[in-house]
Every structure is written in structure tokens, then in C-alpha cells.
Amino acid sequence: MEESLSQRKRCGDQVLDHTLHTLNMLYKENHIRPSRVSRIAINPLWNIVIGSQNECGISDNVSKNPALYTNHNHPEVMRLQGMVGKPLFDIAEQGISSGNLQDRSLAIAAMSALSQQFLGCSSVRKRGYQAQCWMAADTIVQQYPMISRLITHDDVVALVGYDSLARNLRGHCHKLHVVDQNPSETFRTVLLDRTVTYGPLDIILHTTDEMPDILGSADVVLIPASSLVDDSFRTLVNYVHHARLVGLYGMCGALIPDEFLLQGVDFITSFRIDNPSRFIESMQHDPDMANVVRMTQRHFLVMRPDADRGVAR
């Protein structure tokens, strides 16, 4: 008998360890020799790992160490430089078990680099999942594939983190709740004419104290992939009780989806780095790598086979 939504297990437990194991199996099955780290880029907002065959991986940087950007003799700079030349799998394995947020972020970036050749839509489909890919200039972007395929006007949606997704979701669901660690006034605009009104409209802002209740009662929950870096992913998934769908979004989500979809995530929306030369050039000259990735690399939406079942087209 098919399991009901309430019976579907959403645990998020050791998902990175299982993903690394699956990556190892894919490399062995396809007789591919894994690369070593050829370059690391550190930015206050992101970390990048480049492999020796120009594989590119990116992850959110949630650690704070201003000295890295001004003192090339800083012990941490020297320590991180020591990772260059090591196997990507070693950086990933050591980092995901580390309590050091910088190492954990670099581990996810290394896993992202290792994942790239298995993120193509044809490769994902061969492994039994639905996949859709597009570029920023494609018409499909205007149709918001995630929204049109998965979210209905009757859904109560909870978004963790105030992201551009909030703008796209406005008007496409019954209610949109956004939970962010920053105070709600960070995102508010006061509009003054003959009256006083406040924006954004149609978005209900919440503090993190309200997280369990908001995520526990929503129909669709969207979790940032940056939660993999600070190790809050499992906690967020465990807050979900009622949701029909749980989605993962963001740059850190550029990982093979297999284990996430087995552990209770229903869909992932992220990016595949299929123009490495543009990516490598930009990482040195453009601090807004999120926009670079959004505009120059391939977007993807990966889903469980029945994730969009029952959604009106």
C-alpha cells in the first residue's frame, strides 16, 4: 500500500554522509578518476572549490573571519592553502564531520564539484527522478517551473530565509510565511502618501522563534540549502509535520539529489556549473557570485517521481 503523506519519513539524518557514499559509488561504477583540489576561493558570502579537471563547486560561507582577506600570512590562510592538491573526496569526508563551519562549507563545495557531472538532466532521469533544466534567458524561467508545477493557489507556503523566491511566490499561493533570523523590519518598506502602508504585501514575516509552528503547519516548506553548512537541515526537516511537499533551494543544493529525495525532500531547485571558464573568471572579479551563477549557469529542478501528482496544470 502506498504510504500517506503523514507516513512519509522526513528525517534528514546524515544526508551528507549518504550523499558522499553515493558519489563514491557513482565514480566507481562509471570508472571515473576523481579530481584533486586545484584552487580554493574564499569570500565573506561564499566558498568555491575548483577540481583539477575544472569541476566547480560552490557553498555558502557562514563563518566570519575578516583577517582572511587582509593578511596572507594568517594561520588560517596557510591552513586552507594546505588543502590545495588534496583529493576532493578527502576534503569532503573530513569537512562534513567537522565542527568548523569553514571546513564544512568547503566540504560541501567539494561535493558540489564532484556532483557536477551527475547533475545533467539525462543523468538524473536515468537514476529514476524527474528533472528539468534551463538557462536564465529561456522562456521557461518566466513560467517559474517550481511554482507552476508544484504549488497551488490553495497552498500555505513556508519559506525559510527571505530570498528572491518570496517575490516569485507572491500571488501564487494562499498564504506565504517567511521565517528569517533577521528582525522583520529589515525587510519592511514604509509607503507614505495620504495613508501609511507597509510592504512587502502578501508576505507574513516571522522570527525564528516561530519556526516550529510555521513549518509544522504549512502545506509546502522551502528550506535553504545553506542549512547544510550550519548543520540545521535536520532540525528544520524535523519541524515539518503537515506538509505535502518539502523543497530545498539555493547554491548549496548543487549536489546529487538521490539521498535528499530518499530522506524526505520532495524537490530541489539549484544550479549546475556547465560553463566552468566563466565561473572561474567571475569568482575572482565579481563578489556577487549568486547573481553570476543565476545568470550564466544552468538552473535545474529535480523531483521525486510523484512529487507533482495532483497539482493542476
Question: Which positions does each model-derived feature cover?
Answer:
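Conserved acidic residues
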Residues: 155, 174, 219, 266
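Residues in the short beta-alpha loop(s) of Rossmann-like NAD(P)-binding domains
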Residues: 163, 182, 252
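Conserved nucleotide-cofactor-binding alpha/beta core module
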Residues: 172-217
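Short beta-strand/loop segments at the ligand-binding rim of alpha/beta enzyme cores
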Residues: 175, 198-199, 239-248
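Electropositive, gly/pro-rich neighborhoods at or near active sites that engage anionic ligands
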Residues: 2-172, 300-313
